[in-house]
C-alpha cells in the first residue's frame, strides 16, 4: 500500500490490526489524530523500573491500551521499508545477543561502548527526518513520529522534548532506523582500521587482533566524532577495553574462542 497521508496510514493500520493486535479501528482517522496529540498520549503510558543487567534499575515508559496496539501496527507497517545492516543485531529477526557476541570471539581486543540515554536522545525531529529519508512523506512521517514519541525531560537542555520511550513496541525499530547513518559510518570506520563493529541497541562493540585503542588514538577520536555528530553521546563510565586472557564480555555473554553464558562459563571453570 502507498501510504501518502493520515487516511492511507489509518487504512494500513486497520488492515494489519487484526494480525498485530486482534482488533479493528472503530473511529479510524479520529482515533489516530486524537492519539497523535501530546496531551492524550501522555495519559496513555505507565512507568515502572526493571533491574539492569549489571546494577541499578532502568525506567520503562510503556504505552497502554489502544496506543500500544497502534504502535505495534506502525512497527509492522514500517518494518518492510528498513533493511537491517549486517552490523545490527538488536531488535532484528533471526539475530540476538548471541549472534552479536559471536562476531567478536577469539579476538585479542574487545572494546565495549555504551550510548548514553539512548532512547530519550532520539527525538521526534530525528524520527521524522529518518522516516522521510526512508521514503515516507512529511505528513505521514509527522503522524508516525507523534504517535510513537512522548514528552520527556531533557536534563542537558533543561526542557521537555518529544522522544522515543523505552517500552514502546515501535521504539526498537524506529531507533534502528534513526541509527542508519551512525551504523554506516562506523562500519566504514571499522573497515578502514581492520576492526569488526556490531551494535545491539545502545551497546556498540569493536574487536580486532591488533590494537587501535590507545588513549587519544586516531581511531578513537574518529569514533567519538562520528557518534557525537550523529546526535549521540558515549557513556564514558561504561567504556571497557578487554584484552585476551581476561574475561571478554559482549552484550552479557562471555566471548573467548566461543560464546558462553555466565552459567556455561562457570561450569567450564569447575571442570577445567
Language-model regions, residue ranges each:
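A residue-level signal for conserved active-site and pocket-lining positions in enzyme catalytic cores
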Residues: 74, 171, 252
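A conserved non-catalytic segment of reverse transcriptases
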Residues: 226-272
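N-terminal low-complexity, intrinsically disordered segments
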Residues: 22-32, 77-78, 82-85, 126-131, ...
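Active-site-proximal segment of RNA-dependent polymerases
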Residues: 67-117
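Non-catalytic, polymerase-adjacent accessory regions of viral genome-replication enzymes
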Residues: 1-49
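Conserved polymerase palm-domain catalytic core
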Residues: 103-201, 205-243
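Short, conserved non-catalytic motifs in the polymerase core
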Residues: 46-71, 89-92, 151-175
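Short acidic-glycine loop/turn motifs at beta-strand connectors
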Residues: 52-54, 209, 257-258
